[in-house]
Amino acid sequence: MRPSYPTTPGTFQVDLRGLVDLLSRHLYRSPDVYVRELLQNAVDAIAARRRLEPGVAGAVEIEVVEPADGPPTVVVTDNGIGLTGTELVELLATIGRSSKRGELAQHRDFIGQFGIGLLACFLVADEITVVTRSARDPDAQALCWQGRADGTYDITPVDSDLTAGTRVHLRARTGFEHHLTRDHVLALARRYGGLLTLPIRLGSVQVNNEPPPWDFPALTMEHGRESALAYASRVLDLDPLDAIPLHADGVRGLAFVLPYEPSPAARQDHRVYLRRMLLSESADRLLPDWAFFVRCVIDADDLSPNAARDGFIEDERLARVREQLGRGIRDHLKDLARLWPARLAGIVATHDAGISALAVHDDECLLLFADWLPVDTSLGRMTLGEHARRFGELRFVRRFDDFRQVAPIAAAQGRCVVNGGHVNLSTLLERLAVLRPERRISELDPTEIVDSFADLTAEERSEVADLVRLAETALRSHDVGVQVRAFAPSQMHATLVTNEDSRFRRQLDRTRSVVDGPWSGVLAALPTASAANSQLCLNVANAAVRELARQARQGSIMRVRRAIELLYVQALLLGHHPLRDRELGLLDDVVLGFVEDRG
């Protein structure tokens, strides 16, 4: 009995139309890449011929035919190496193999790296016609290869005026006519091939007549910098703060400092070329993560493009280039610090987060940039350099909440306290304290603010004794101590001073109140730290507090108690401390008591 399956070797049957649809949806971002693929094949073919005939002058001609009664046709002609009949069969007819694959594997002066080749042209055409004549044989006959979207093809000899080289004809698919119109093809040719060195023409129009930005005069010269900034405005629609020259192994380009502060998590949209052919206008992962404040334009010789040809493969070469480009940006900023400090000041004012991220890992950069880093203080925003000139010693608090707590009091006292709650800032200040001990940089404990308040006289302590006793009774269940001091600003009734342990306990209590299930048991088992260092400091310089002291002496116990509870909740809110359930209930009870005019 004969088996129901073939017993001889077979080949996979490829649904070409389905494969093209897959490419269009998942590999290529736009069918417009067909122009890039045609230009790439032409450039590669000319590079191959130059290896055979070093003196040949390469050229690429594009023609667009737009008949009144039919779809447009695009014709791309090059005077490259051409193809023999054997190559047509072995290469063009084999899905997944580039028409230049063998040579591409051997020579770095070719752009192409993948066997997508003419397959991309099926994104916009149902039929591709290739007329070619090989330069390897002076007697070679011109051949015509016709491939169709159903996966069939045929090869025939033809009479053609084509000398050595290749001519590709594409006729627009239904629904894709716009992609093959003259204006659209011209725009795409300029976009993808505008920086290629080979002359490319569409009819009488020279497509590539602009020098690449990395060939501008040295950016240390003002006219070179102006040319680079003008390029960014014209091509990238960007008005950058500065232009930075980039150099790495086989890579050259420019980095433009953004005129706004992007999110560190934002995608880096860089413009990348491979041997002057545009690959992508939205590539990322080219620079270190800290360099999110620049957008670059680069050209690479040896980096490997990914399958979609819209970026580079993440490999050791790209990692090395990324490190080198980051070093170049860092060195440029160092040069600005020495030579153009005003320019650097403008950059740091906009991108202090990125500069800080760089300085965290580089002591030299920290020393260079420290004086330009802006900080928020109790006396307003200023640079660290300005702070050093005005105040000498620098005191900072580590947390935003601590800064909110101490800032109004410190400002009223004329003290300049730095908010170290911003990303990396506390780390930078601690490191700067080690590198520059003469700057006298140290962390401020918020309790030091209370310690700086003037002590009361014996008479004043006697006047507020009843108030302190009532306040301690009212707040005992909240584990809060009470002090009375006189401090500025007099408009502040009270301030709540906490330490790390009391903040942890407050957050733990708040979490316990909203968590149930297995985690509630875990939280219940956690040890509870003492909150003895949480202190409500009443301000006797405030008229309302003095009135409460008077009423306490007169025995208005309930009214004073309600007022103390209200001042406690107010201090919590002003200090941005999380309210626990019992404090929310306390606030509700206090408000209700005043509404009902109890006590």
Q: Where are the model-predicted features located?
A:
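GHKL/Bergerat-fold ATPase module in large chromosome/replication-associated machines
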Residues: 110-112, 131-152, 173-178, 183-599
